[in-house]
């Protein structure tokens, strides 16, 4: 079971002040525990890719992060640049304001631009920033992600007012059905936290506390 859990974790370090030494430690830990991926900012993709060469650990990065307020063209360029640097997965933030405005065509086109840019090269996870949305908006965001051809929906950036909840994961899973992945991120700090997310329907976990989770310890990290 522990190995299965390890393969569900995106070992994450997205803090602005992350140093080269910290990224190298992240990658070493990911290799040690055989995590699914490391999730790093775009500036660290190339170095992480080099460090993880020959391992099963993928490189995941973030697009339009953390606000989601870039244009679709900029997000698409970010994806292509990330792939050129070695990214295997991209976690993009939706246009949250457009969703609130019920400008669903723009929200879907924005996701579709990223999906198109990643096609054949990288898996796409769509961050809906659930803490800022009503349940109705969460459902709509997930439906738009499905329509745009995304691979996953994801709760949170970890940089807003809240993180993943089991209730949100259950709602997202119910909305997207069994085919799409669902990623819980933000505030998953212990093995118990992770178990509750997986039981609710999560298939991937984004956490900076991956090592603590694997050791069954509660970390004092905020992400």
From Swiss-Prot:
Q: Which UniProt keywords apply?
A: Cytoplasm, Lyase, Schiff base
Q: Does the keyword Cytoplasm apply?
A: yes
Q: Name one GO molecular function term.
A: deoxyribose-phosphate aldolase activity
Active site annotated at which positions? 91, 154, 183
- Catalytic reaction list: 2-deoxy-D-ribose 5-phosphate = D-glyceraldehyde 3-phosphate + acetaldehyde
Q: Where in the cell is it found?
A: Cytoplasm
Q: In which pathway does it act?
A: Carbohydrate degradation; 2-deoxy-D-ribose 1-phosphate degradation; D-glyceraldehyde 3-phosphate and acetaldehyde from 2-deoxy-alpha-D-ribose 1-phosphate: step 2/2
* Superkingdom of source: Bacteria
Alphabetical GO CC annotations of the entry are: cytoplasm
Q: Which Gene3D superfamilies match?
A: Aldolase class I
**Keyword Lipoprotein found:** no
The EC number on file is 4.1.2.4
Give the family from UniProt.
Belongs to the DeoC/FbaB aldolase family. DeoC type 1 subfamily.
- NCBIfam families assigned to the protein according to its UniProt record, in alphabetical order: deoC
Report what the protein is called.
Deoxyribose-phosphate aldolase
Q: Which organism is it from?
A: Lysinibacillus sphaericus (strain C3-41)
